[in-house]
Amino acid sequence: LTQRGAAYYPPQSEWGSQDEALVARDQRWGLVWGHGPHRVRYSVAYDPEEFKFALNTMTEEAKVRLLMHAYACDAIVEDGRISGVTFQSKSGRFAILANVVIDATGDGDIFTSAGAAYEKENVLPWLWFGMGGVKNPEAAIDAGGWFFHTLGEGRVLLPWGATERVTRKIDATDPDDLTYAELACRKRVMEEVDRLRRESPSFANAHVCHIADQIGITESRRLVGEYMLGRDDVDTPCDDVIAITGHWTKY
């Protein structure tokens, strides 16, 4: 991504710095936000379309067999363990058996169908979007707008959607709730676009570049596993760590 000019992130030598100028620079990119005290974090602003291409290239190079346009349905449970998953495609229903199944649905669809225990919380829906053709984005950001600088000339990213957000919490596993949220959020997006064109000179001739493909949610189902992470675990390094976040957590 960096080679293609499709990513921006602070160099490792700056990570952890509390230099106000560096923090302010990264805030403009949306790499630092939330409650202080602030410091430079490892966080990346990237072009989502370029990111998709990079992921496709990486999986091909790793000899991963991809199967798109097929949707996971139910876990196949044998002797108390998941031995495979059924899928639905336009060619019909089929199953894939495996020694290890990883539920990467984000909503626990597979472990739920296997009967695993979970917690669930209703959340506010979001719909991020980007605009192009913005005249002098830096001046627009300086004026106090709720948007970030992003990759590409004259473009900004509007996080969490419009200023006037949807205030009804939804069950992110309920299709009726998701339908309501998508329609409501898309309406808010266009209202925000019209407002910015009307009120901000920088956006007078701006246009919508991209609206997020899916409703943004922070969580839905949480697996009740052998060990449940709690607030005391937030700053505790783990030997089996698999991911790092540069941002806040409410837990």
Predicted regions and their residues:
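A structural motif corresponding to the C-terminal end of an alpha-helix
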Residues: 58-65
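Flavin (FAD/FMN)-binding glycine-rich loop and adjacent Rossmann-like elements that form
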Residues: 2, 12, 16-32, 36-37, ...
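Conserved FAD-binding subdomain of flavin-dependent enzymes
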Residues: 3-7, 58
